[in-house]
Amino acid sequence: MMLLYYALSFILLPIYFIIILIRLLIGKEDIRRIQERFAIGKHRQVYSLDFLHNEANKERFKGDTERRTAAYTSVREDSSTGSTSKLPLEASYARSLIWIHAASVGESMAALTLISNISKRYPDIRFLVTSWTNSSAKILTAKLPKIAVHQFLPIDNIIFTRKFLKNWQPNLGIFIESELWPCTINEGARQCKLLLVNARISDKSFKAWLKRKSFFQLILKNFSKIIVQSERDLQKFNELGISDAINLGNIKFANEKLPVNQEELSKLSSHLDNRQVVVFASTHPEDEEVILPIIKNLKEQFLDCYIILIPRHPERVKSIIDNCKSHNLSATAKSQNDLPVLSDDIYIVDRFGEMGLFFSVATISFIGGSFKQGGHNILEAAYFSNCIIFGPDMSKNTDIAKGVLQNEAAIQIKNGEDLLTKLTYLLSPNNSLELKAYRENALKFVENNQKVLDEYLQVITKFL
């Protein structure tokens, strides 16, 4: 079966190239890094000069001037990006490289949490983080510490995968959640032990894998350990023939609080002047179809209410502004004005990495992707004690949604009319105590679930 997949991956190469080209044309690929899709990367190893300057590592190189000089001269400056890239050290010095694959934005935040906590225990370890989407790449490039580097995952073909693995030679691979690339996983397991963490299977994928159970088992046998995020997912894995998976809960419960620039927060808070801020976060066009028609009504009822919209894909900003105009709403993007135009109906945040800043000033946050896409990360807003609202489709975050609802830490709505009713109720001064309770419960929920991270680390560190 795997040989058949390998053969198909060659037959389908022209289609892969066309897909990459289309993604490039619509702005979903970075032309400056397109070579990484073919395992041609400027970063050949993740160690940097600080690794060589480390006292412990100076000791390792002591008395071996030739290798020390080679290590130093292998570090070069990439003038186009300003990043430091490096040729591989000898295998004996490249033994502490962890490769983490995070498909998209949510998984990337979990990767950052793992890196932060593993590096505290093992300061000599370095990290390679791969992802597939441009949005996750931008976040990771901005947030990764010096001990880590990001690269796009190459096309799932044996030629590119083997070249990628030869370049990096990781010593442990960690795949987060549900993106299973057969060739990458099969070849990766030949290089090092692989772990699948925070694993989940959507209902749709589960039905598809049931028809290809033997192939699913063939892919999953490459993992030395599989940790799922819920009892429901554990049951699905068991039904698919994976009997040794364990459930430790959702690592997204342990995501670290999003960073906030305190100077910018001070300016923003002062500018908003105690207005009640409602944030619509990680929105898709399907969400905006529901949200935009109710905003005029909401603002007419609550003059001190201000709306901030943060699209999942900021490159859609022009179409969102046009859509606002069609609903007779005025809107300004952050790229046009660094602070909200208070006379406008909506402020659109079209920059990455600023979600924490706007959650900091929000009273209520609606989590996008929850009408048709299965929902996005609820917990990021919970860390900022926001009253959280989400739509009817949380199929990708079922257990988190169930948990917050059971703890009265969030509200689920059915449609636009229901959303307007809930927002009107919560923003009414008569219901301020109930609003306060939802906000407090959201923060308590994430604080009480921090133990999940410790349990994950106990398992992961056994493979270091």
UniProtKB/Swiss-Prot annotation:
Known pathway: Bacterial outer membrane biogenesis; LPS core biosynthesis
According to its UniProt entry, this protein's organism is Rickettsia felis (strain ATCC VR-1525 / URRWXCal2) (Rickettsia azadi)
Q: What is its main location?
A: membrane
Q: Which reaction does it catalyse?
A: lipid IVA (E. coli) + CMP-3-deoxy-beta-D-manno-octulosonate = alpha-Kdo-(2->6)-lipid IVA (E. coli) + CMP + H(+)
What parts of the sequence cross the membrane? 2-22
Could you tell me the membrane topology recorded for this protein? Single-pass membrane protein
Recall the taxonomic lineage recorded for the source organism. Bacteria, Pseudomonadati, Pseudomonadota, Alphaproteobacteria, Rickettsiales
Q: Where is this site: Transition state stabilizer?
A: E177, K252
Record function comment = Involved in lipopolysaccharide (LPS) biosynthesis. Catalyzes the transfer of 3-deoxy-D-manno-octulosonate (Kdo) residue(s) from CMP-Kdo to lipid IV(A), the tetraacyldisaccharide-1,4'-bisphosphate precursor of lipid A.
Q: Where does CMP bind?
A: P311, R312, F352, G353, E354, N377, I378, L379, E380
> Which InterPro entries is this protein grouped with?
Glycos_transf_N (IPR007507), Glycos_transf_N_sf (IPR038107), Kdotransferase (IPR039901), RPE1 (IPR005728)
Q: What is this protein called?
A: 3-deoxy-D-manno-octulosonic acid transferase
The answer to whether keyword Cytoplasm applies is no
Catalytic site residues? Answer: E107
Q: Which family does it belong to?
A: Belongs to the glycosyltransferase group 1 family.
BP term (GO), one: lipid A biosynthetic process
E.C. designation(s): 2.4.99.12
**Pfam families according to UniProt:** Glycos_transf_N (PF04413)
